[in-house]
């Protein structure tokens, strides 16, 4: 018998939750669905957040306990995230690309992968790769 799983929600360990919220909200259109209490008096200094867009959920978590973090991200840690890719099903890959470019987000030119998916990629502030893809020719 299988386990009746209904969904999966990635949790990304990030350097600065408010900075990541701003990226996913402003660049991609996610809404903040839930947050932890702020770590400090700054009302947006959350350690955890749940984001939603069209039924897609994504969690962000501060990679440092009690918001004690260095002044700059650890570049080795950011580089280690480069092998993590989140794939989003997106019918209009060209439209997503145009929207990202218009918002000043560096995105790869859409192309069809050898396995038939049209894709464009971006990298978030913590080095995680995001792919927007759809089967080529099936819009």
For every predicted segment, state its role.
Residues 11-58:
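Core segments of cupin and vicinal oxygen chelate
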Residues 1-22, 83-86, 135-139:
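N-terminal beta-strand motif that seeds the catalytic metal site of vicinal oxygen chelate
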Residues 34, 121, 133-139:
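Short beta->alpha transition motifs characteristic of CBS
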Residues 36-38, 71-77:
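Short, P/G- and charge-enriched loop/turn segments at secondary-structure junctions
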Residues 16-18, 79-126:
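Vicinal oxygen chelate
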Residues 66, 114-115, 135-139:
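A short acidic/small-residue loop/turn micro-motif
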Residues 50-54, 122-125, 135:
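Active-site beta-strand termini and strand-to-loop segments that position acidic
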């Amino acid at each position: 018998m299988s386990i009746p799983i209904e969904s999966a929600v990635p949790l990304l360990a990030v350097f600065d939750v408010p900075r990541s919220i701003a990226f996913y909200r402003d660049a991609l259109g996610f809404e903040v669905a839930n947050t932890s209490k702020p770590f400090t008096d700054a009302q947006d200094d959350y350690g955890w957040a749940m984001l939603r867009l069209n039924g897609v959920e994504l969690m962000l978590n501060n990679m440092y306990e009690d918001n004690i973090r260095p002044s700059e991200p650890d570049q080795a840690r950011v580089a280690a995230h480069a092998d993590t890719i989140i794939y989003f099903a997106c019918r209009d890959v060209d439209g997503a690309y145009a929207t990202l470019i218009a918002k000043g987000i560096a995105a790869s030119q859409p192309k069809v992968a050898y396995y038939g998916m049209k894709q464009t990629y971006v990298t978030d502030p913590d080095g995680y790769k995001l792919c927007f893809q759809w089967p080529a020719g099936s819009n």
